A protein has these predicted regions:
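An alpha-helical, amphipathic repeat domain used for nucleic-acid recognition
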Residues: 1-190
């Protein structure tokens, strides 16, 4: 069951009866409507400036001028800030799952955050939680679930898994070697 406002049928829309096109909104109403839509989109989830711009323009009912007005108002009110968004997004993702710098940079690029802003946010996030600590957590979790890699195929599988998580090649090689060389703990000892 859908919640929210009921949509009127085509017969009930203003100006559309008898095949006439709808009247365009006056600029003031268009700006207010775009601002209202932007606030709803931000209430659903945090977004970057460009991501929000794209969402507002995608339906075609908002023009560039009213979108620019809405974005400037939201920045003025402090609701829209790419630096804060990038840092919050990156720290949340790292706390949820150990991810490497490359993966987070790619995710922020997908969210349309500028490279400079993303790099600054990643620098702060990885100062709090170093990448070495994250890759160690990722390896420990994988070993807990699948056991220590015994064959070349299992080692490659672990390596590929860490690459997908976005860790650098050199760091993966070093940590996988450390994990392979580490003596296995006896599970039967108490």
């Amino acid at each position: 069951m859908r919640r929210g406002r009921q949509r009127k049928s085509k017969e009930g829309r203003e100006g559309e009866e008898e095949g006439r096109p709808r009247k365009p909104l006056d600029p003031e109403k268009a700006r207010a409507r775009t601002l209202q839509r932007a606030v709803k989109l931000l209430a659903a989830k945090p977004r970057s400036v460009e991501e929000l711009r794209g969402r507002l323009l995608e339906k075609g009912w908002a023009d560039e001028a009213s979108v620019a007005y809405a974005l400037s108002k939201l920045k003025e009110y402090g609701y829209l800030d790419d630096e804060r968004f990038a840092f919050g997004f990156a720290s949340y993702r790292v706390k949820q799952k150990p991810l490497g710098r490359q993966r987070l940079a790619r995710d922020l690029k997908t969210r349309k955050v500028s490279k400079e802003t993303a790099d600054a946010a990643l620098e702060l996030v990885y100062q709090e939680t170093p990448e070495e600590e994250l890759i160690t957590r990722a390896i420990e979790k994988r070993v807990r679930l699948r056991g220590r890699p015994a064959t070349r195929q299992e080692t490659k599988s672990l390596y590929d898994h860490l690459l997908r998580l976005g860790f650098s090649y050199d760091l993966i090689i070093r940590k996988v070697r450390e994990a392979s060389d580490a003596p296995e703990e006896d599970e039967g000892e108490a």
